[in-house]
């Protein structure tokens, strides 16, 4: 048992999770609910390489009930197939954890600026589905998490860049570095595209989101350079 526990500790350390020994009470994982969600996502995402996952996804997409897909479509969000699979996984995890009595309690700073986005309105529709089908009420933390996930995983195609100081400064720095190194002047029409790319990249880093999978038919929008 001791050797098995050592191996478990090593495996969990990959996810920055540590075991706390409690005398007379066994062991406890030092981890919050958001970190549990991230690990669950990683575990299920590894199934995308197996036929069983695609069999499940195909079955889901072939059913008459395609409300989730239709909601994303009706809100004009552009998402690759791999990102869509990841969104379905995280949405399912959110529902399952809430049904088990473990809602998300993380406070997402400065979230108010995202409440006027298509992604937030999409999450409001998804919350309605969760309530109707599973009697689950998503709190503000759940809605914030799902909104940020959609923003990070979605394409920047057809989006309008909302100016913010940090992103704009970083964009100008990159363009200046390109010019000083190559004497290539980047046309202003690429400014918003690059700014959107940088903005979502910073969000992914801040909230530990996975790298975005671009839409290849819109690669110039998703990856300007």
Model feature map: region roles:
Residues 2-225:
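A cross-family "folded-core" feature that marks the main globular domain of proteins
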